[in-house]
Amino acid sequence: MAQSNGAQAITTVGVPKEVKTMEGRVSITPDGVREFERLGINVFVETGAGDAASIPDSHFVAAGATIVPTAADAWAQAMVIKVKEPKEEEFQFLRADLTLFTYLHLSAYPKVAAALLKARTTAIAYETVQLSDRSLPLLAPMSEIAGRLATQAGARFLERPQGGRGVLMGGAPGVRPANVVVIGAGNVGYNAAWIAAGMLANVTILDKNLDRLRYLDQICVGRTTTLASNRGSIERALVDADLVVGAVLVAGARA
């Protein structure tokens, strides 16, 4: 989403500390700071912004950044880069001459969309930046991590102490492995399936894109089963599934 406020050269970038619960990432590394500084763009990092990511203020300073004491100081810059969408406590910092670059997922957060429109902020959502081949380069890293974590978490919740049925992903001598069904063969789905296959589970991937399924057949070399996705194939796959990973993406839509 973007609300144009005129073409202006960006000379300063602010990096506020993330305030969303359980969010420990920071939107820039010291290497990124160096790149901005090389271009003549000054970077202002809120103190402690990188602590949860094990990047202390001193590392940002060594890269050329200026550490500022408050979120307001970081938000006061021409462009602000974040990891997650602004929380309501941050709406006060939105303004017409600000460019905000972050993951927004506006379909899931209508209050954020309304706040951006009201403030007339230029907002660029990482997840909707698209190349000419329709790929989503800024969403891909998040998707890769999400897919791998989905299988890892799913394996844990199959354990009895977590309320599961006591199914081991890779089985054991004389015991079948888990049946894992992945719906969607994009970045999330592929990574979820790859980890499940590495844990020696029986893996089935469903997708409507047959070219994508052909590609996965080639790189997975028999470690997974690919199926054309439709109501019937999904129903049949789910009957015997121990773990199901939903990995369907509609760009810009609510997950």
Report residues per predicted region.
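Short beta->alpha connector loops at strand-helix junctions that form conserved
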Residues: 46-47, 70-71, 103-105, 125-130, ...
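An N-terminal-biased, well-structured beta-alpha scaffold segment characteristic
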Residues: 2-115, 119
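Glycine/serine-rich phosphate-binding loop and adjoining beta1-alpha1 elements at the start
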Residues: 2-12, 18, 88-179
